[in-house]
Amino acid sequence: MSNIDFTLVQNQAADAASLMPSIAGKKILMGFWHNWPAGPSDGYRQGRFAEIALEAVPKEYNVVAVAFMKGSGIPTFKPYNVSDAEFRRQVGVLNSQGRAVLLSLGGADAHIELRSGQEQPLANEIIRLVETYGFDGLDIDLEQSAIDFAANKTVLPAALKLVKDHYAGQGKHFIISMAPEFPYLTTNGKYVGYLQALEGYYDFIAPQFYNQGGDGVWVPEANNGNGAWIAQNNDALKEDFLYYLTESLVTGTRGFTKIPADKFVIGLPANVDAAATGYVIDSTAVGNALKRLAIKGLPIKGLMTWSVNWDNGVSKDRVPYNWEFSRRYGPLIHGVRTAVQETDEALSRLAR
């Protein structure tokens, strides 16, 4: 392998985007941010997501994943509607608030094809993007055939180790995360190789608990000991689904591989337009599931959503979603009460 090619690195003056905020020991609310324009009816229910400046993402989201780094050959990234300098400035705004901005690699429609020998070139490109835009880490969001296509499973982890070690040498912490669909986390699942290769390097895993229809988890002790299949699309059992699937993953039981609880983040859709299935109708299901996990000594790191843009989108009838996800779960994750929450509760009391 060659060394880091510093001719690819754009020298930047020390600024807020040069920071790499720490998420160690912190609960996180993570949201994906769309790097493409909205269409008239992009949602699963024909709604429309909001185009949002990165710096306008609500502060409840203390980790923002920019979607996506992709392309043939060595994948890359370019802001779709602002200059490189302006994008870096906006990353700096979030960094100055202690918020991390990750670059997400892949996406549902991305064809990523890495070959043996591209470890260093990929590491060089990631470093170039970090130095250009101020990213604080990389999120692996490979889906479908891209997960194990070509040499992706060996080249990508090797490149990320080079990048993380590079920034560690500068006294910085480069974040590595993943957002796999949960069926790929069974004991023989496609993502297990990434977990093993990046053991000791990854910071958190945010499985997608959505778009999986009737897939779920078999719980032998449920149903009075007779066992029960608890499916992702069973809204009546949503709390149990969130609890048992998470418990299975953080303990490595019921056919799933183990991810430490303090590195585990539940991924949920912002609303019914953001995913075909998986939306949580009653938010108390999330709060109760998290409480049950904590009581069992398995408190997790936080929640993730697809996406911040959908969180402020509109329905088919142009009814605003009005940041429902961050309003619901920001206070739950960060342990603070917001003015919006207090106002809503006051209005609720007056209406009684």
Where are these regions (language model features)?
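Enriched but not universal
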Residues: M1-Q12, Q341-R352
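Chitinase-like catalytic core of GlcNAc-active glycosidases
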Residues: F6-L249, A261-V265, A270-A285, G313-F325
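Substrate-binding cleft of secreted/luminal carbohydrate-active enzymes
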Residues: N35, G252-L350
